[in-house]
């Protein structure tokens, strides 16, 4: 009888432990709670925004998808109105400063005293040094603009070649 109780106890313990493992595995997406996403040739960016008494908070992840490693990363975010006038800006230096390919780093900025209105935009600017193999590092700048409320990318208009 005691042998049967031991077997049932071990079985119950294994079932409960495996359920914990499956539950933890299901929660491993680092961008699950970040509703806005942008993908470019060099970085993937995922973020969320929320208002506090200090202003507009932007928190997210920056993932290197192109280079063997990037370093000296500066991420700047600008709040623009519909006429592209800068209403607020902030910069951060994501840590760690060296991001290997397929690794990501968290970032956070506060656009102080910012209260976005309908039609406002966020412009993300990523300044970094990229290194591919043994060729040394090159400085790059990557940027994109999105609607503040939806995260939908706004393509910048390209002027006709005859316009100067």
Regions found by a protein language model. Name each.
Residues 1-20:
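Sec-dependent bacterial lipoprotein signal peptides
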Residues 38-72, 132, 136:
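Post-signal-peptide N-terminal segment of Sec-exported extracytoplasmic proteins
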Residues 28-31, 122-164:
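Surface-exposed edge beta-strand/loop patches
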Residues 17-36:
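Bacterial Sec signal peptide processing site at the extreme N-terminus
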Residues 65-106:
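The feature marks short-to-medium sequence segments in extracytoplasmic or secretory-pathway proteins
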Residues 62-64, 79, 111, 128:
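Hydrophobic beta-strand positions in extracellular immunoglobulin-like domains
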Residues 89-140:
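Short, solvent-exposed, Trp/other aromatic-anchored flexible loops in extracytoplasmic proteins
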Residues 57-61, 74-76, 106-108, 123-125:
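Beta-strand secondary-structure signal
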């Amino acid at each position: 009888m005691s042998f049967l109780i031991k077997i049932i106890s071990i079985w119950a313990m294994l079932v409960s432990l495996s359920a914990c493992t499956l539950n933890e595995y299901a929660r491993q997406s680092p961008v699950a709670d970040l509703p806005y996403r942008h993908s470019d040739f060099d970085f993937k960016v995922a973020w969320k925004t929320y208002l506090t008494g200090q202003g507009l908070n932007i928190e997210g992840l920056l993932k290197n998808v192109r280079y063997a490693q990037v370093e000296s990363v500066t991420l700047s975010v600008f709040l623009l109105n519909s006429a592209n006038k800068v209403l607020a800006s902030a910069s951060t230096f994501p840590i760690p400063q060296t991001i290997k390919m397929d690794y990501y780093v968290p970032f956070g900025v506060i656009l102080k005293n910012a209260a976005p209105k309908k039609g406002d935009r966020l412009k993300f600017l990523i300044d970094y040094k990229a290194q591919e193999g043994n060729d040394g590092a090159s400085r790059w700048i990557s940027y994109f603009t999105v609607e503040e409320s939806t995260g939908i990318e706004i393509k910048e208009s390209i002027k006709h070649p005859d316009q100067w």
